[in-house]
Structures are given as structure tokens and as C-alpha cells.
Amino acid sequence: MIFIDACFRKETPYTPIWMMRQAGRYLSEYQESRKKAGSFLELCKNSDLATEVTLQPVEILGVDAAILFSDILVVPLEMGLNLEFIPKKGPHFLETITDLKSVESLKVGAYKQLNYVYDTISQTRQKLSKEKALIGFCGSPWTLATYMIEGEGSKSYAKSKKMLYSEPEVLKALLEKLSLELIEYLSLQIQAGVNAVMIFDSWASALEKEAYLEFSWDYLKKISKELKKRYAHIPVILFPKGIGAYLDSIDGEFDVFGVDWGTPLEVAKKILGDKYVLHGNLEPTRLYDKNALEEGVEKILKVMGNQGHIFNLGHGMLPDLPRENAKYLVQLVHAKTRR
């Protein structure tokens, strides 16, 4: 698989590409599948439809990897927090974590309840071409914890950060509990058939450097170390969004580092490029305009050259991006990097 070879810095015939949120609302096929499911959460839980949605971008765009269609919040959901998705607002937990007692009341072994995810993986792997990789994923302990404490997305993360500074032992108990679940969750994804795993630390930038390293990065290192110990042949990709200023403190046992669009690739390459393959980082809104898209691709390829790079966006696809431009991006990257 070209994608897996690239994760391990092996020679590839061209630079592989996939896109975060490549299965999404910009595809009419996705809209139809979601309509059939009835809701976003039901789509995640319906393995047949989730498989359909996982495969769509590979078939339509020609990307080199599929990423499992699911949501990071299925883990806290199965740990006992009731979850709803409110239209135009996003996820909302009906109960939140407020103290040690509420951390202790969370169910252990939630990963055993996620058979709908593992079924989606095995179905997708059966239908996916042998040349294409399937990526599994989860959210980072810190990012999941913010949703569980705030109850929803947040601009300030005030409740989470208040807990971090005033009751760090409570937050650490939650992060530890989540880490143990996530190690087993990703292990079962691997056993079900994914070829690589990715951990999204979407709210990494909410923390100052020292707090980030202690309350997020340390847990990412713990998870990736255990996964590499168990499955050395499976690439681990970490994507901590918005920590470009902290790159000099990044270390650990993983293979690929996801660079967001706010971090110049030349900076990431200088600091991390010898240790890790880099993944990213086209500004997603460049896909609105072909000229802007071409300019962005040129800039990235000039910095990254032929090895140590997987092409991706620096964040997720937006719902109204023109699909023809997404397809063009894949063709352009393949053509420009063919060696």
C-alpha cells in the first residue's frame, strides 16, 4: 500500500493523498446515506451505511486511503454519557463530568460496546481495494475530556481549564481512564482490519505549552507507545491542532505528525522532519478556487520534496467545497509527484 509505505518513509511512486473529513456534506452521495440513516449518530451506528460513506471518497475522488466513518464521541457515549447532535450546533452531552465521583461513575470497558465500529471496519476492508489503506481513529484524551466537562464545544474551555488548574487530580483521573479505553479501542480497530490509526487532538491549542505537555501530550505518548509495542507494523499518526509554537517539545513513539494549516511546513520540517513523516497541510478554503489550490500545492511540494510527506489538508473539508476541486486536487498531487 502506497499510503503505508509513505508512513514508514519508504519509496513510493508518488506522494499519497487523502483529506480529513473527506466523507462529508460536500458529497451528495453522503447526504443521501445520511438521509437514509435518519441522523448523524444513527449513520455512525449503522455499519452498512457507515461502510458506504467510508468508501465514497475513494470511489469518487481517487484518494489513497479511506478513513473510518465514525465520531470521536462514541467512546464517551459508551462510557455512559448521553449524547445528542443538535442541528447547526453540534454535539451535546446531557450529563457532564464535574468531580471525581462523576469520573468514577464512568463505565469501564466501553470499547467492548463499539461493535458497530468494528463491523464497519471489517465490511469496509472487505470491499476496499487491496492497494488502498483504511485508517482508524479516535479523539485524544484531552479533546474528549473537554467535551465531557463542557458538555459541548467551547470557545474558552473555561470549565476544563478551571479543573486543570484547581483540581488537576480529577482531570488526570479522567485522562487516565480515557487513555486506557482508547488503547483498547484502537487495538480492536486494528484487529478488525484498519491499516493505520490516527489520534485527533482537535483542541490542543486551548492549552499553554506546559499544560499541554502535561495534560495532553503525555497521554498521547502513552497511547502511541503501547500501540507501537503491540503493533509495530501499524503506523500511528498524531494530529494536535494548533501547537506550531510547541514543536520543539514534541517527541514520542509514533510515525506521522499531522501539521495544521496555521503551522508553516518548512518550520515543521526543520524541527520534526528527520524524526517523523509529515502529513498536511493545505489550507482547506483554497479548494474554493482552482488557482489558489494550485498555488498551495506548489508551495507544499516545494518544501516537502519526494519523501517524508503525505499530502492532506491542514484541517477538515468544508461542507460547501466544490467536489470537482477535491477530485482535481488528488489528480494534481499524483501528477506532480509521480517519479
Swiss-Prot record:
The reaction(s) this protein catalyses: uroporphyrinogen III + 4 H(+) = coproporphyrinogen III + 4 CO2
Keywords, alphabetical: Cytoplasm, Decarboxylase, Lyase, Porphyrin biosynthesis
Enzyme class label: lyase
Alphabetized PROSITE patterns for the sequence: UROD_1, UROD_2
Subcellular compartments: Cytoplasm
GO biological process, one term: protoporphyrinogen IX biosynthetic process from glutamate
Assembly with partners or alone: Homodimer.
Family assignment from sequence similarity: Belongs to the uroporphyrinogen decarboxylase family.
Name of the protein in question: Uroporphyrinogen decarboxylase
Organism: Helicobacter pylori (strain P12)
